[in-house]
Design a protein with these regions (language model features):
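C-terminal-biased regions
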Residues: 1-88
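C-terminal effector/interaction modules appended to NTPase cores
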Residues: 85-197
């Protein structure tokens, strides 16, 4: 399917009554599509998808369109949102420890490439901390470095291990056995789509 058709298909899944913080509506998207402004339309659709939960098909169409336009970060974000539609959303405020107290010395990309371990309160059969792995997406900034703080989204490798988390819970991030950062859960939502068997 070509880019305009993918964007049109995604647009049809957006309720007419929703608007972004900047009062962007689906009518604005249709105007940009009519003028072949596909990249702008894609960005507006991503923004509308952050306002109101939209189905997996919406994010899959946007991911394919972004890939065809070679917009790597947009494609990565839309694939991330596909994961969230299937498995749920976990958002947190993360504070990394300073370089003097942490293994990490340099910033990392915020685009969902870091896969740290997390202490989320689970225990091994012998009572030791059981660390769980989750990809990390940093919101609103491209990188995050030692001593910095940001809003993040987490994509657990095994979402069932994370179901007990609630807003207000504190979890710790580990790139080795030492604590690299502390996060406070701010949002937990269930999946929009039924996971594939």
């Amino acid at each position: 399917m070509d880019v305009p058709k993918l964007l049109e298909a995604a647009s049809l899944l957006v309720p007419a009554e929703i608007a972004s913080e900047n009062d962007i509506t689906i009518n604005d998207v249709w105007d940009y599509l009519a003028h072949d402004e596909w990249e702008v339309a894609l960005g507006l659709l991503e923004e509308l998808g952050d306002v109101h939960p939209l189905p997996l098909d919406f994010w899959e169409s946007l991911a394919t369109a972004a890939e065809q336009m070679r917009l790597e970060r947009s494609a990565a974000w839309c694939h991330w949102r596909c994961y969230e539609a299937r498995n749920g959303i976990i958002r947190a405020d993360l504070a990394l420890r300073p370089a003097s107290e942490n293994r990490r010395r340099t910033p990392f990309s915020g685009a969902g490439v870091l896969r740290p371990m997390w202490n989320i309160g689970n225990r091994t059969p012998t009572g030791e901390d059981d660390l769980n792995i989750a990809l990390l997406w940093v919101e609103f900034i491209p990188t995050l470095g030692p001593g910095e703080r940001a809003s993040v989204r987490l994509a657990p490798l095994d979402p069932s291990q994370w179901r007990h988390l609630q807003p207000g819970h504190t979890i710790t991030m580990h790139e080795d056995r030492t604590i690299g950062g502390t996060a406070v859960i701010v949002e937990v939502q269930g999946p929009m789509a039924t996971p594939a068997p």
